[in-house]
Curated annotation (Swiss-Prot):
<feature type="binding site">
    <location>
        <position position="350"/>
    </location>
    <ligand>
        <name>3-phosphoshikimate</name>
    </ligand>
</feature>
<keyword id="KW-0808">Transferase</keyword>
<feature type="active site" description="Proton acceptor">
    <location>
        <position position="323"/>
    </location>
</feature>
<dbReference type="GO" id="GO:0008652">
    <property type="term" value="P:amino acid biosynthetic process"/>
</dbReference>
<feature type="binding site">
    <location>
        <position position="25"/>
    </location>
    <ligand>
        <name>3-phosphoshikimate</name>
    </ligand>
</feature>
<keyword id="KW-0057">Aromatic amino acid biosynthesis</keyword>
<keyword id="KW-0963">Cytoplasm</keyword>
<feature type="binding site">
    <location>
        <position position="169"/>
    </location>
    <ligand>
        <name>phosphoenolpyruvate</name>
    </ligand>
</feature>
<comment type="pathway">
    <text>Metabolic intermediate biosynthesis; chorismate biosynthesis; chorismate from D-erythrose 4-phosphate and phosphoenolpyruvate: step 6/7.</text>
</comment>
<dbReference type="InterPro" id="IPR036968">
    <property type="entry name" value="Enolpyruvate_Tfrase_sf"/>
</dbReference>
<dbReference type="GO" id="GO:0009423">
    <property type="term" value="P:chorismate biosynthetic process"/>
</dbReference>
<comment type="similarity">
    <text>Belongs to the EPSP synthase family.</text>
</comment>
<feature type="binding site">
    <location>
        <position position="323"/>
    </location>
    <ligand>
        <name>3-phosphoshikimate</name>
    </ligand>
</feature>
<dbReference type="GO" id="GO:0005737">
    <property type="term" value="C:cytoplasm"/>
</dbReference>
<comment type="subunit">
    <text>Monomer.</text>
</comment>
<feature type="binding site">
    <location>
        <position position="24"/>
    </location>
    <ligand>
        <name>phosphoenolpyruvate</name>
    </ligand>
</feature>
<dbReference type="InterPro" id="IPR006264">
    <property type="entry name" value="EPSP_synthase"/>
</dbReference>
Amino acid sequence: MSLAGLKSAPGGALRGIVRAPGDKSISHRSMILGALATGTTTVEGLLEGDDVLATARAMQAFGARIEREGVGRWRIEGKGGFEEPVDVIDCGNAGTGVRLIMGAAAGFAMCATFTGDQSLRGRPMGRVLDPLARMGATWLGRDKGRLPLTLKGGNLRGLNYTLPMASAQVKSAVLLAGLHAEGGVEVIEPEATRDHTERMLRAFGAEVIVEDRKAGDKTFRHVRLPEGQKLTGTHVAVPGDPSSAAFPLVAALIVPGSEVTVEGVMLNELRTGLFTTLQEMGADLVISNVRVASGEEVGDITARYSQLKGVVVPPERAPSMIDEYPILAVAAAFASGETVMRGVGEMRVKESDRISLTANGLKACGVQVVEEPEGFIVTGTGQPPKGGATVVTHGDHRIAMSHLILGMAAQAEVAVDEPGMIATSFPGFADLMRGLGATLAEA
């Protein structure tokens, strides 16, 4: 894929059966937990994108032996803990990776220095560093905890921590640090977030206690990791990533005559908010062949071209679909009426300011968008937008893929300026979409 640009053009119907790449969240965690565990962990279906490979290299730097045995098949020999790295840990663009790794590293009496690419160096890490500091870790770095920074861990105290925002990354960092904290840890969530860390800790042999408790008219989720948990290597089958499956599925919904099935998609209820929302918009979206793999429910999803209508997305749904709002906004651009997306301020501190970039990209393609501090409103006419724009992505893979999907059904082609970053989460995106019949070419 050219770094200079990539463009998509309207064409015929999209048809076919494909598999989504492995889930990025579970792929990161399989590497980290495998390195923390004692013994052998085998992984199948790993997402071999740039972000996960950066996490794999980091685990090697912390002393784990990691080998690739085939496409998506990896073996991790863990030593039951981390060794002090001899060089700086470069996490590339992997925000999930660096935040979880810092949590894991905080449990060991050593120093580790972390950096990343330009985008990651601009993202604040304070939300993770604050609870780690309360547990006894120390750090030295730039303003608001921006990378590069050095973390010194060891001798951690237990912590009862209420998340100030819905963040699975912060929760996971505290839980991973809690593996080596005196007294264990408890994380209290005001809104339930993706629970892959809890599920996978159990799969590796740890005890994790999850309880929902009422406080007034609100329910809080309490996640407790008792002291002294040990991890043992296991087998991980990585399901298809619902965030990646969203792109071919939405493409099928907006390109006339299309029918696309994505097999093996994870259906964890804390990750499927987009599919619920699309069905509320009138999408012909059918889930079949539901089964369980490595503790996660998976299934096949078929999408057929649909006339969509605007909806109000409940703000409390945001944690279950925070990465999918850019592609939801594309679907909304083809719907009739307003689609209101609020309570998504978290989008502004992702790989880019995704609220502004999504709004600006859609506006450039002729879509009516109102940007708000914590969200945006997209008004569609029920007809294809005009397209014909080059969208500025600031190197954000989800912004790039979302607008390329728009171009497949717009009145004129749409180009994106930095498609190279798509490899962070969906390295086979262009080939998969071409295989379904899409027109994609270098810009």
